[in-house]
């Protein structure tokens, strides 16, 4: 953070606050006083040497408190008339026409200029306001002159050479989907594929195209991947834009007080997209999206602290400086990271209000500022409406930013948690700007929540992390913008606060008692005790290289549970070139979700398991033991971290796993690495397959070779193979039985060489599944005897042969 820049921000906000205060524009004054105070707080954190900085902070916050009553009592200015709004739309049409004009998009520019002229003339004929008529006619004249100037070269033969160099309107072309961040849209870092790639990034396989096409339809609406062509999206229209899909479904709580849908110009005289990006100004209402609002808050805080576009870069239209701007025509486009790629979401600006005219969605404390409400609306549209089932910040922040999600459970039996190591890591990474953080409470009784000032299963934004003389603190924001922690170091704690600590944390309990904005300090120990999960979102720019694969796992492939066999699980080879000093490789598994019910009742428990098997396929879950085992969680995102310390080539097998496979899933595996690597699906060398359906029944359930009298009664099959080649044999039986098989050579064609054998087995008997893989089996005739470990274990089985040459099979017994 730059202390000088923050000091300048504070001066600018204070000047605007005083100006609005003198003009009687109290709502805007309140907003800017708060922003001035926040800028000073951040400036002090960054090492500002300004004198009496805490006094100034208190002064601004006290003025905020004093103005609240004035805001309530002051009558609002009359809203703009329809004809004044038409003039604003005409101005926007001309502005957009001028942008197309500058780019040389002649036909687009002419169309927009013409529509502006028609709107000006129509409105001028409807209004009796002479001043307004003059403005409309003047604007119409300017637009008409430019439209005619552009049209003239297109109609004169002697200007054909000149006009040939001018761009004419071409239909936008949407090619294959981008695999990662679009190089035309954002420039954080180059995402270069270690696989085959072209000049613009990674190529798609036919399977990937089908996966992304299938999961483009979310809750019945298609959200296409965001492409460079979408930067030419049209936003200017003579009439207010209305989403063709209609209004969003409201939540039950909204319906109880809902009055109507309004546009920003129905609420304020001066709608603006963004006055200033601030986490302090964001307020959640009755939509159950606390994690989403917390995600907005920390994204805004990050953008403010590090002066890097994060949340403001996802909403369009934007001006030439890349700043989102208010559109009087009411159309907006938001880029969200959904189901493997950034996707395009179109919304109008209609928002729900109650009978008092108060918004029933999240909003900025500056009622003229729109970005909070519009980004929330875009996300709610994708999720099927404001009747949002709830989420977590990992999911929401990934959708908003594309940053890498990680989950730290503080009270989990399956995940170890180190309080000291976690704080040290969070402190260092937070202040470097590497990570966004939220914290969520777990289930608690109403009495517990009331006692501690906490909301059960609620997400809080982490705004700051500090350490002072061995004491460790986290600053949190409740998305409700009220209701704070009541335990140690709350504003009412008279025992633990010292003048020294207050100065270090820029916190005055007496001032805080005057206004509840939902922001508070809590000790790290108390957070670990009373909160349940910390959600992290990591900046992908930390990694030099990244690539991904989009794929599908069919529910019909393999057993419901993979506790005994991984033969049908998707598997990938990851080969990493680790430099001196070590490196980190992260693998993110993301399941695509296309239905609100699936989102609300996520029953798919996914994980990623890592094996050190040189990139070869793994068949048994515990043989060899996993290098990194996965915890199966019902979240759409699962992050695996591989830490390398030894220089050289490291090769891993990555296995996608589920707890109980109920449905076909579509997913993306994305690898982030600080060093070069290759990543690909493990190919099958086999081109032919044959299955035998058999059963152990009565006498033929003879058991293993330990039971000599009955073993000879087991089914016996014979197979003929004409050429030497690789062979994979798999036996699948009832899970409650341990199964195995033997292969016995009957006759070998020619010299078998080193690959000849008399007898081979599948090894130890295993529950429900076993296999034998031979790199080169000589041509010849072989018998195979499948059996259960114990006699009299009856049931069906499948015997699968996978090869590169035809195999003939017969049953001998």
Swiss-Prot record:
UniProt GO cellular component terms: centrosome; cytosol; nucleus
Domain N, as annotated region: 702-813
Residues with N-acetylmethionine modification: 1
CDD domains per UniProt: CysPc, MIT_calpain7_1
Recorded family membership: Belongs to the peptidase C2 family.
Keywords: Acetylation, Hydrolase, Nucleus, Phosphoprotein, Protease, Repeat, Thiol protease
Region (Domain III), start-end ranges: 541-701
The organism's taxonomic lineage, starting at the top: Eukaryota, Metazoa, Chordata, Craniata, Vertebrata
Keyword Repeat: yes
Modified residues (Phosphothreonine): 95
EC number: 3.4.22.-
Name of the molecule in the record: Calpain-7
Boundaries of every Calpain catalytic domain copy: 232-540
An annotated GO BP: positive regulation of epithelial cell migration
PROSITE patterns named among the record's database cross-references: CALPAIN_CAT
Record carries keyword Hydrolase: yes
Localization annotation: Nucleus
Tissue specificity remark: Ubiquitous.
UniProt organism field: Mus musculus
């Amino acid at each position: 953070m730059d202390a000088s820049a923050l000091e300048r921000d504070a001066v600018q906000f204070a000047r605007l606050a005083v100006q609005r205060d003198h003009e009687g524009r109290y709502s805007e004054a309140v907003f800017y006083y708060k922003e001035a105070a926040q800028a000073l707080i951040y400036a002090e954190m960054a090492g500002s040497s300004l004198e009496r900085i805490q006094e100034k902070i208190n002064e601004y916050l006290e003025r905020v408190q004093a103005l609240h009553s004035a805001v309530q009592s002051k009558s609002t200015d009359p809203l703009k008339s329809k004809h004044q709004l038409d003039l604003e739309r005409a101005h926007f049409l001309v502005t957009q026409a001028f942008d197309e004009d500058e780019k040389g998009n002649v036909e687009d520019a002419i169309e927009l200029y013409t529509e502006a002229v028609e709107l000006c003339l129509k409105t001028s004929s409807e209004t009796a306001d002479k001043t307004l008529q003059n403005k409309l006619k003047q604007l119409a004249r300017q637009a008409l002159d430019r439209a005619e100037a552009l049209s003239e070269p297109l109609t004169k033969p002697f200007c054909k050479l000149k006009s040939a160099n001018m761009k004419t309107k071409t239909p936008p072309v949407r090619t294959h989907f981008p695999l990662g961040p679009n190089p035309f849209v954002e420039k954080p870092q180059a995402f270069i594929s270690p696989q085959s790639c072209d000049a613009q990034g990674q190529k798609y396989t036919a399977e990937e195209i089908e996966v992304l096409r299938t999961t483009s339809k979310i809750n019945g609406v298609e959200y296409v991947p965001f492409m460079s062509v979408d930067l030419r999206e049209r936003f200017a229209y003579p009439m207010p834009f209305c989403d063709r899909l209609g209004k969003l479904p409201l939540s039950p709580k909204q319906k109880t007080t809902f009055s109507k849908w309004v546009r920003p110009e129905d609420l304020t005289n001066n709608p603006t997209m963004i006055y200033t990006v601030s986490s302090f100004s964001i307020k959640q209402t009755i939509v159950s999206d606390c994690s989403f609002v917390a995600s907005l808050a920390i994204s805004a805080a990050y953008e403010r602290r590090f002066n890097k576009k994060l949340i403001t870069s996802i909403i369009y239209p934007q001006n030439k400086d890349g700043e989102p701007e208010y559109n009087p025509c009411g159309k907006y486009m938001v880029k969200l990271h959904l189901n493997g790629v950034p996707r395009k979401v179109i919304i109008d600006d209609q928002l729900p209000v109650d009978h008092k005219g108060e918004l029933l969605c999240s909003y900025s404390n500056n009622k003229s500022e729109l970005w909070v409400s519009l980004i929330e609306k875009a996300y709610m549209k994708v999720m099927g409406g404001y009747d949002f089932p709830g989420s977590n910040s990992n999911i929401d922040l990934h959708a908003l930013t594309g940053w890498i999600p990680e989950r730290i459970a503080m009270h989990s039996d399956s995940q170890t948690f180190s309080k000291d190591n976690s704080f040290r890591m969070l402190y260092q990474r937070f202040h470097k700007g590497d990570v966004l953080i939220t914290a969520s409470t777990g289930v608690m009784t109403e009495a517990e929540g009331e006692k501690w000032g906490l909301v059960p299963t609620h997400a809080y934004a982490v705004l700051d992390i500090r350490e002072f003389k061995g004491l460790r603190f986290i600053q949190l924001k409740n998305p409700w913008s009220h209701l704070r922690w009541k335990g140690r170091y709350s504003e009412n704690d008279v025992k633990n606060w010292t003048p020294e600590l207050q100065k270090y944390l820029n916190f005055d309990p007496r001032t805080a008692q005057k206004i509840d904005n939902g922001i508070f300090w809590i000790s790290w120990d108390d957070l670990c005790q009373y909160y349940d999960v910390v959600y992290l979102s990591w900046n992908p720019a930390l990694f030099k290289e990244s690539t991904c694969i989009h794929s599908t796992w069919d529910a019909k492939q393999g057993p419901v549970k993979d506790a005994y066999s991984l033969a049908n699980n998707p598997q990938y080879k990851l080969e990493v070139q680790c430099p001196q000093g070590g490196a980190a490789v992260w693998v993110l598994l993301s399941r695509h979700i296309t239905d609100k019910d699936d989102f609300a009742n996520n029953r798919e428990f996914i994980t990623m398991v890592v094996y050190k098997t040189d990139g070869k396929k793994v068949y048994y879950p515990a043989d060899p033991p996993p290098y990194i085992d996965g915890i199966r969680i019902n979240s759409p995102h699962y992050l695996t971290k591989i830490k390398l310390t030894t220089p050289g080539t490291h090769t891993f097998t990555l296995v996608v796993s589920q707890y109980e496979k109920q449905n076909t899933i579509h997913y993306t595996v994305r690898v982030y690495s600080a060093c070069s690597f290759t990543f690909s699906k493990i190919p099958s060398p086999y081109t032919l397959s044959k299955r035998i359906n058999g059963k152990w029944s009565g006498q033929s359930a003879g058991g293993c070779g330990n039971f000599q009298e009955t073993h000879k009664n087991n089914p016996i099959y014979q197979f003929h193979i004409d050429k030497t080649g690789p062979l994979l044999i798999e036996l699948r039986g009832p899970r409650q039985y341990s199964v195995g098989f033997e292969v016995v050579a009957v006759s070998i064609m020619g010299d078998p060489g080193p690959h000849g054998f008399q007898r081979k087995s599948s090894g130890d008997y295993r529950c429900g599944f076993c296999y034998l893989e031979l790199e080169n089996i000589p041509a010849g005739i072989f018998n195979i005897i499948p059996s259960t470990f114990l006699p009299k274990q009856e049931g069906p089985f499948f015997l699968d042969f996978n090869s590169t040459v035809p195999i003939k099979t017969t049953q001998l017994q």
